[in-house]
Amino acid sequence: MAEQRNINFLSRREALKLGLIGAAGLTFGKYAFGEDANSLATKKRGNAKAVIELWMSGGPSHLDTFDPKPQAGNDYCGPFKNPISTNIDGIQICELLPLLAKQADKFSIIRSMTHGSNAHETGTYIMKTGRKPGDNLVYPGMGAVVSLFKGYDSGYKGLIPPYIVLTAAEGRFSEEGFLGPRYKPFATGGDPSQKRFAVSGIVAEGISDQRQKSRRELLHSLDSLGKAMPGNKEFEKLDACEDKAYNLILGDGGKVFDMSNEKDELRDKYGRNKFGQSCLMARRLVEIGVPYITVNSGGWDTHKQHFEMMRRKLPELDKGFSALLADLADRGLLESTIVVWAGEFGRTPKVLWESPWNGGRGHYGNCFSAVVAGGGFKGGRIVGASDDKGEEVAGRPVSSADLIASIYELSGIDPDGPLSNPKGLNLQVMPSANRLKEIM
C-alpha cells in the first residue's frame, strides 16, 4: 500500500511538471488520495447543494453596513447618519446599500457575532473554522469540510474542483488544514471583470484555444515514445490525467469561466468590477454543481480614511450582493444555495478621528455582524442585538461555531458527526455548537 501511495504521488508530480493542472486534486480521482469520506457517518439534515461565501477580507464595519447606530452620534456613525428602511418593517441598514434594502426579505442579519480577537489571522481562522487556535492541530476551513463531504469522495463528478476561490486565497489558516492538499481550494487568480478572465492553470492570458490545442498535439507526439514502452502503466495514468486536464481547459469545464454569453444587462446589474463579476461567476459555478465557492473582497481594513473607502466599497457590495440574491432567486437556485456574508471581525464603533487615522476604524472582534440567505435560512429576520453604540453584544451572542454548524446542518452535514484526521483522533465536525434555529 505504501508503494502504491508513492507511485500515485509521483504521477501527480509529473503531471504538475507538465503544467496540466493548477490545483491539488484538480483532475485526480480517489486513487491518488487517502480516506473515502463516504466511510464517515453523515447524518442527512438539510438539502442545500451549494454554499457561496462572500468574504470581506480585512473586517467590515458593522455600523456602516448592517447595524447602523445613528443615535450614537457623530463619534460613532460619522457621516452615515441616515440609515434606510428595507422592504421588511423595522429593519434598517446603511444608506449606501439601497439595492440590498430591497432584498431584505431574502436574507437575515446576525448582529451579535462575537469572538474577541482583534488579529487578522486569528480572526480569520476562528471565523473560517469555528475553532480557536491553541492546540497542535490546524483545523480545516468550512470550504474544505464541505469539499470533504460533498466533493470527490462523495461522488462529485465535476471537472471544476469542488472548492473554488474567486480570485485570491486567504492563506493557510483558512484553507484545508489537516485534511491535506486534496481539499485545498482552487484559487482562480485573474479578474472576471476583464475581457478575458485569465484563470490560473486553465485560461492563460494571451493564449488562444487554438494555441492550447497545438500544445496538446505537441505533447502527444512527445508522449508517444514513453507510451510505446510495453507495460508502462505510469504513462497510461498520466495520459488519463492529461485528458482530464485538457477537457477542463478546452471543454465544458473551461467554458464556465467564459462570461461572453452573459447578457450585458445582467453583467451591469452585478457591477463591472472584480467583486460584482466574481459574484456572477459564483452563480455560474453553482449552476454546474460546484458545492463551495468563496468570493474574496479585499480592502476592508480601513484604519485610515474609513468613510472615503466605504463610499467606494459599499456601492460595489450593494450591486454585487443584491444582484446575486435576485439572480439566484430568479433561477430557482436560492432555495438550494446558502449565501453567507462575513469578515474576520468588525471595526471599532468609535471613529478614530485623530491623526494619523483621520477618520479610521480599528479591528473589533467583540461585536460585529454577518448575513445569511438561502439554502434553508429564512429571510427578513434579525438574530441577536448589539448595544446602543455597537460596542457589545446586548442579546443572543452567536459564535462562529454556531454559524458554521448551522450551515453544515442545512448542507446535510452532521456537525456532531466524526471528522476524519491524520492522527486518528476522535474529532467531530463542529462539536458543542448551537444552531441558529430561529432562522432555520
Outline where the language-model segments fall.
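Ligand-binding pockets and gating/stacking loops
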Residues: M1-M440
